[in-house]
């Protein structure tokens, strides 16, 4: 049979145990979730400054951007492989965009992409 202790002694030993376990525990770091949310928000504010976006809509937009990114990357990779190249260049990306996006949307995407690449190379 276990030895009996007074109520005060039991409480004290319980407190001591809690303090030890709290100090031994390390703080868990919050894992980072990569997202396009800040960029989507910046574009939204450029186009419609007075419009907001819900977290669910932001999640959908983030999924959309990830999906399009994966499709373009896969198509560009395929094009590089067909042409026996080991590097994906802006040319492969541009061709992939032309193949994936319909008509006018592809034209606008290519012109915006070209503008972004030109801006990037001139700033170097």
From Swiss-Prot:
GO CC entries: nucleosome; nucleus
Glycosylation sites: 111
CDD domains with a match to the protein in the record: HFD_H2B
One GO MF term attached to the UniProt entry: protein heterodimerization activity
A Pfam short name: Histone
Record keywords, A-Z: Chromosome, DNA-binding, Glycoprotein, Isopeptide bond, Nucleosome core, Nucleus, Ubl conjugation
Processing after translation: Monoubiquitination of Lys-119 gives a specific tag for epigenetic transcriptional activation and is also prerequisite for histone H3 'Lys-4' and 'Lys-79' methylation. GlcNAcylation at Ser-111 promotes monoubiquitination of Lys-119. It fluctuates in response to extracellular glucose, and associates with transcribed genes.
Cross-link Glycyl lysine isopeptide (Lys-Gly) (interchain with G-Cter in ubiquitin): residue positions: 119
Localization per Swiss-Prot or TrEMBL: Nucleus; Chromosome
Annotated stretches, region: Disordered: 1-32
InterPro entries named in the record: Histone-fold, Histone_H2A/H2B/H3, Histone_H2B, HISTONE_H2B_site
Similarity comment: family membership: Belongs to the histone H2B family.
Assembly and oligomerization: The nucleosome is a histone octamer containing two molecules each of H2A, H2B, H3 and H4 assembled in one H3-H4 heterotetramer and two H2A-H2B heterodimers. The octamer wraps approximately 147 bp of DNA.
Functional summary from the UniProt entry: Core component of nucleosome. Nucleosomes wrap and compact DNA into chromatin, limiting DNA accessibility to the cellular machineries which require DNA as a template. Histones thereby play a central role in transcription regulation, DNA repair, DNA replication and chromosomal stability. DNA accessibility is regulated via a complex set of post-translational modifications of histones, also called histone code, and nucleosome remodeling.
Name assigned to this protein: Histone H2B
Organism: Anopheles gambiae (African malaria mosquito)
């Amino acid at each position: 049979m276990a030895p009996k202790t007074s109520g005060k002694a039991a409480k004290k030993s319980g407190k001591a145990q809690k303090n030890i376990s709290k100090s031994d525990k390390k703080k868990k770091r919050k894992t980072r979730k990569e997202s396009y949310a800040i960029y989507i928000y910046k574009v939204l504010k450029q186009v419609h400054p007075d419009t907001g976006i819900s977290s669910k809509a932001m999640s959908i937009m983030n999924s959309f951007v990830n999906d399009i990114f994966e499709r373009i990357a896969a198509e560009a990779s395929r094009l590089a492989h067909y042409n026996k190249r080991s590097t994906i260049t802006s040319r492969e990306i541009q061709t992939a965009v032309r193949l994936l996006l319909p008509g006018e949307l592809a034209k606008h995407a290519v012109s915006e992409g070209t503008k972004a690449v030109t801006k990037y190379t001139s700033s170097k």
